[in-house]
UniProtKB/Swiss-Prot annotation:
Its main location: other. The modification Pyrrolidone carboxylic acid is found at Q20. Transmembrane segments: none annotated. One of its GO terms (cellular component) is vacuole. This is Prolamin PPROL 14P. Keywords: Pyrrolidone carboxylic acid, Seed storage protein, Signal, Storage protein, Vacuole. It is found in: Vacuole, Aleurone grain. It comes from Oryza sativa subsp. japonica. Belongs to the prolamin family. Residues 1-19 form the signal peptide.
Amino acid sequence: MKIIFVFALLAIAACSATAQFDVLGQNIRQYQVQSPLLLQQQVLSPYNEFVRQQYSIAASTFLQSAAFQLRNNQVLQQLRLVAQQSHYQDINVVQAIAHQLHLQQFGNLYIDRNLAQAQALLAFNLPSTYGIYPWSYSAPDSITTLGGVLY
C-alpha cells in the first residue's frame, strides 16, 4: 500500500513539474517573438506603474496618451544615438593615436616613450572592447611594446 502511495505521489509531482516546464517554455518563446518596441515598453512598465500609483488617475491618463508614447520613443532613440556616438568617439581616439604614431615615426617629432607605449596599449585593447576585428584577424594573446615588456 505504501509503494502505491509513493508511486502516486511521484506521478503527481512529475505531472506538476511537466506542466510548470511547459508554461516556462511558452513564456520563453513568447519573449523571443516580441518586438523590440514592446520589450522597451515592458522595461519601462514598472516605472509607469510607480507613477500611476503615486499620482493617481491624472498620471495614468498621461502615461497612456499618444504624446507620452511618442516622447518615450524619442528618448529611447536618443539614448541609442548617445551609445553610437560614444563608440565613434573611441574609434576617433584610436585614429588620432595612429596618426600621432605615424608622425612620430616619419615626422621626426619627439614623443615621450612611456606615453607612446600607453597609447599603443590603449589602441591595441580598443578593438576587443567593441569587437571590431576584421574577419581574417584574431586578437593576439599579448603585445610587445617598445620597451620589450609583454602585456
